[in-house]
Amino acid sequence: MKNFTRKHSTILIVEDIDWIRSGMKKAVEHEGYRAVEATNDAEALQLAEREPPELIVTEEELPTFYDLMSHLREHASLNSVPVAIVNPDAEDGAQHGDAYLLADYADITSLLAVLRY
């Protein structure tokens, strides 16, 4: 992944649980990035098509996760956008294809490492 310029980088957070999504948004914005929120794949795709983000953060347990990933990979202008996936069974820093894996949303340090990578 690339190193993101904070003031101009938009991070799309796709999470269906309000308090998790809100916490992630606060952490990302605290570090100087612009955060955009979506609760499902349809909302995420609509936002991403309107203004492609520099990074998408989502979780594998999102009910529409596989639909989201499928649509992103099929969409010409979005298939190169890096994705960070929260998967509790993953080891932080591992990569799965072109996606960066995070073990837990709560570990903000891991997310910030992705942003700086």
Language model features by range: what are they?
Residues M1-E15, Y66, S77, A103-Y117:
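Non-catalytic signal-transmission and effector/linker regions of two-component phosphorelay proteins
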Residues N79-E91:
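A short, hydrophobic beta-strand element within the central beta-sheet of small alpha/beta folds
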Residues I17-V36:
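Two-component/phosphorelay signaling modules centered on CheY-like receiver
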Residues D41, T58-E74, N87-D89:
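Conserved phosphotransfer microenvironments
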Residues A48, M69-H71, L78:
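Hydrophobic alpha-helical motif in two-component signaling modules
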Residues S9, P53, F65, P88-D107:
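As written
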Residues E37-L55, P63:
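Acidic, metal-coordinating helix/loop segments flanking the phosphotransfer/catalytic sites
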Residues P52-E54, S77-P82:
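His-Asp phosphorelay/catalytic-motif detector in bacterial-type signaling
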